Each structure stands twice: as C-alpha cells, then as structure tokens.
C-alpha cells in the first residue's frame, strides 16, 4: 500500500517532464465518485478532498468475494466523538524494532482503524513487499497476503490531506483512489514531497528505527514492479506488532460502540484489478 489501498501498486505516470508516483493498495474497493472500475489508475489530485472528522467514521464494506486477498476482520468500533489519542506502536521486525507514534488528532479515523487491526494481530508475521528508491523513498507494508492487493474487510476515508507532509519519518496510508484506505501504509525514509501529490493520509511518524527502513531502501530492490520499485533486496517483515502506549484524552482508539458500516451501492461494486508485482 505506498502505497495505497490498498495496497500495493506504485503507479508511475510520466507526462512530458512531470512525474507522478502513486502509492496504491489495489484491494478491490473503489468509490462510486471515482467513475472507474480500475483501482490501479493514478487518481486525480482534484478528487482528493478531505478534512478531519469528529466521528463516527462510517466504514465502507469491501467485497471479499471479489478479492480473495482481503481478510474478514469485522469493523472497528466507531464511537462519536472519534478518539484523538496518540497511539504508540512497536513493530518488531526481523531487523529490529520500529516504533511509530500514530497521530489521532491529525487522522482519528485511520488511527482508530490501525489500532483495531493491531489489536486483532492483523499485522503479525507480515512481509513488506515493496521498496522504492527513485523519485520517492519508501517501504510499503501492511498487507498480510504479501501481494499488494490485501487488506481488511472495510475501507476508511482520507483525512487532513491539505496538511500532509511527506518528509523523512512520516507514515502515510496507501490507497487506490479517494477514500479507499485499508491496512497498507508506507514509511518515508527521505523527503518525497516532490514525488508525491497530497493524496495520502499521513497517520504518524517513526520515532525509532528509521535507520532500519533507510537501509532497506538504500540496499535497493529487484525492480519487479513495472511501475517502479519492487521487492526489497533486504527483506523486511513484521514478526509482532503491539501497542506500547496510548496518550491523550477521550476513549482509547479501537474500542467503543458498534461501528457504522456503509455498504456500497450496486453501481459502485468494484471490479477486481490485478496488481503488477
């Protein structure tokens, strides 16, 4: 998902001398407003409009029948107001520990979802299938299937895009178009502001272990993705992911009353899109 929705396909679009790299997650969910059945198409920057929410978040159900890479995770609790706490999580990997502070004030709905998935051990024993070292500098993770097309059984809306900054250490959601965030996200190891449009919700920052991610990017990749980047030559996998602490007021993200679930209309039913890997 660098990054995408989910995740996983990086789309390189070249127009004259303008290069746009999209981080996608190809989880098979596509909003009706996009007007296209292809989740791998590079999204229009003008289509991405978002702001912070006070809740409820209103999750959109994904079609598991059309995408076997999705997991039936149920839906996160969806209280009102949505928690705005900072969730600090430890990603124990085969190369050391990466610590991330997820910013519940900047992206409450997406952080609530991440906390929920961590609680369900969704990210345990999960590979990071893609790294990119040209144009943008990222490691894409969060897909248990390792295909770049996986994710949970729901999607989350974009948040606070206008304030997004894709600097070193930032963590952002991968997506397949507006409001299609799932479980995939990407770590940015070097300022990638020039290579990324403000289409990706920033959910937090790396507070420990950025050197691990830098090494993965710097060691290169196999170039297996036709759109750019590929499988890291230095493999990175999450072994265990756990919440280390929660800071701030309000309820704890990932806990609360039953969620509000939105089921896409028949006209918005997605068409599976194969990912380039």
Per-range role (PLM):
Residues 1-277:
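Cyclophilin-like peptidyl-prolyl cis-trans isomerases
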């Amino acid at each position: 998902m660098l990054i995408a929705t989910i995740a996983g396909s990086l789309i390189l679009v070249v127009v004259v001398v303008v290069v746009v790299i999209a981080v996608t997650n190809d989880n098979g969910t596509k909003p009706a407003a996009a007007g296209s059945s292809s989740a791998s198409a590079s999204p229009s920057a003008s289509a991405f409009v978002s702001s912070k929410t006070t809740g409820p978040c209103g999750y959109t159900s994904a079609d598991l029948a059309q995408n076997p890479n999705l997991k039936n995770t149920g839906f996160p609790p969806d209280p009102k107001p949505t928690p705005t706490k900072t969730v600090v999580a430890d990603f124990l990997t085969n190369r050391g520990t990466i610590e991330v502070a997820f910013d519940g004030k900047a992206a409450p709905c997406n952080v609530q979802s991440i906390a929920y998935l961590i609680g369900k051990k969704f990210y345990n024993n999960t590979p990071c299938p893609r790294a990119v070292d040209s144009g943008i500098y990222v490691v894409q993770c969060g897909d248990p299937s390792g295909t770049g097309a996986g994710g949970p059984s729901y999607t989350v809306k974009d948040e606070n895009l206008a304030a997004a900054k894709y600097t070193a250490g930032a963590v952002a959601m991968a997506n397949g178009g507006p409001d299609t965030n799932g479980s995939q996200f990407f770590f940015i190891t070097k300022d990638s502001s020039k290579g990324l449009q403000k289409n990706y919700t920033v959910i937090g920052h790396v507070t420990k272990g950025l050197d691990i991610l830098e090494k993965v990017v710097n060691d290169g990749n196999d170039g297996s993705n036709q759109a750019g980047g590929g499988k890291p030559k230095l493999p990175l996998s999450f072994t265990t992911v756990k919440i280390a602490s929660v800071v701030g007021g309000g309820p704890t993200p990932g806990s609360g009353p039953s969620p509000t679930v939105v089921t896409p209309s028949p006209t918005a039913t997605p068409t599976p899109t194969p990912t380039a890997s």
